[in-house]
Swiss-Prot record:
<dbReference type="GO" id="GO:0005829">
    <property type="term" value="C:cytosol"/>
</dbReference>
<keyword id="KW-0418">Kinase</keyword>
<dbReference type="InterPro" id="IPR052028">
    <property type="entry name" value="HipA_Ser/Thr_kinase"/>
</dbReference>
<feature type="active site" description="Proton acceptor">
    <location>
        <position position="209"/>
    </location>
</feature>
<keyword id="KW-0808">Transferase</keyword>
<dbReference type="Pfam" id="PF07804">
    <property type="entry name" value="HipA_C"/>
</dbReference>
<comment type="similarity">
    <text>Belongs to the HipA Ser/Thr kinase family.</text>
</comment>
<protein>
    <recommendedName>
        <fullName>Putative kinase HI_0665</fullName>
        <ecNumber>2.-.-.-</ecNumber>
    </recommendedName>
</protein>
<dbReference type="InterPro" id="IPR012893">
    <property type="entry name" value="HipA-like_C"/>
</dbReference>
<dbReference type="GO" id="GO:0004674">
    <property type="term" value="F:protein serine/threonine kinase activity"/>
</dbReference>
Length: 343
């Protein structure tokens, strides 16, 4: 069965050749007749477009381009683009397909996710290489720029992994981040729940690179600061040089900062984060323990079929899908471990 390269839903017979559904094209571009093929080749992107590229990746530099819609197709611009184009870096093949699938999952799970999809370079007939394209979230309804501030800047922390001392230890945890966000935006149950679920899904899906710059504040005109939508959310499970280096980009709990102490899960037979640690995290950011145990964690466990289905329908290569789902299933089982005895 063929699936839409935007929505990952089954295509109708008359849509199979293009690879896009009318619904998907309208979702991404407000035009169901839009031509999603890029007007330049991968080689042109590498050799001609570098002066327009900007950005960073899960490790170092990931070329990006700003895009606009022109004559029912995408075109590149130096600035003021409405979309960002992100091909897979050579050192991380199929990262575009990975980000698309993972962001689609986050969208289907109820997170705020900008419109996104996969597009192909021009002139590729036998083997299409996809690039990830996403709507810019720092634009208002009139496409005017809104001020965006990444969390390392907002917190005045110079290192995105929280290594601010001479000892190379991490002194910024997800708990500290969550409290800072809640202090400077809306501190209510829905926001607490959103942050709680965001961090848990980073763990479950193998997003071991969710650092400070992957959280941002948006400052709408004449309004309070808001937490930016999900962005740069990928699974690094298929890339062992990153995945095997750490369980999460930052410590989960404030008491782990500076390597002062270990979360409970590391003192059990499992030797990594378990459900008890996420219960502690949730309580520390203001959630009720009973709500976490009786509602939030069971809801996440019940979302298993949806997660597996979307990855299975994605354009990631099968070995990458298998790798991500192996991590997901293992960590989902660990999340279900509560009141686990310590060694």
């Amino acid at each position: 069965m063929n699936f839409c390269r935007i929505l990952l839903k089954p295509l109708k017979k008359n849509e199979a050749l293009s690879g896009y559904s009318a619904e998907g094209l309208h979702y991404l571009t407000d035009n169901k007749h839009f031509n999603p093929e890029l007007p330049f080749s991968r080689q042109e992107f590498i050799t001609v477009k570098p002066q327009k590229q900007q950005g960073m990746s899960i490790s170092g530099f990931q070329p990006k381009l700003q895009l606009i819609i022109k004559d029912e197709h995408f075109d590149s611009v130096n600035q003021q683009g409405n979309y960002i184009l992100k091909p897979s870096p050579e050192e991380y093949p199929f990262l575009a397909e990975n980000e698309h699938a993972t962001m689609r999952i986050m969208k289907e799970l109820g997170f705020d996710v900008p419109e996104n999809g996969l597009v192909s370079f021009a002139g590729e007939q036998n083997h299409k290489e996809f690039a990830f394209v996403i709507t810019r979230f720092d634009r208002d309804k009139q496409q005017k720029p809104m001020h965006q501030e990444q969390l390392d800047g907002a917190m005045n922390i110079r290192d995105k992994y929280g290594k601010i001392g001479a000892d190379n230890e991490q002194y910024v945890s997800y708990e500290q981040i969550a409290k800072f966000i809640l202090q400077h935006t809306e501190n209510h149950l829905a926001q607490q729940r959103e942050i709680f679920r965001r961090i848990i899904y980073a763990y479950l899906l193998g997003n071991n690179d969710l650092h400070l710059r992957n959280f941002s504040f948006i400052y709408p005109k004449n309004s309070h600061p808001k937490l930016a939508p999900i962005y740069d959310f990928v699974s690094v499970s298929p890339y062992p040089e990153i995945f095997n280096s750490t369980l999460l980009a930052l410590p989960l709990l404030a008491r782990e900062e500076g390597n002062a102490t270990l979360a409970k899960g590391f003192n059990t037979q499992y030797g990594e984060y378990i459900g008890d640690d996420f219960v502690e995290f949730g309580e520390n950011i203001g959630l009720n323990k009973n709500v976490i145990i009786q509602k939030l964690i069971p809801e996440i466990i019940q979302e298993k079929e949806k997660v597996e289905q979307i990855y299975s329908q994605s354009f990631m290569p099968q070995p990458h899908i298998d790798c991500v789902l192996k991590t997901y299933r293992k960590r989902l089982a660990l999340l279900n471990l509560l009141n686990e005895p310590e060694l």
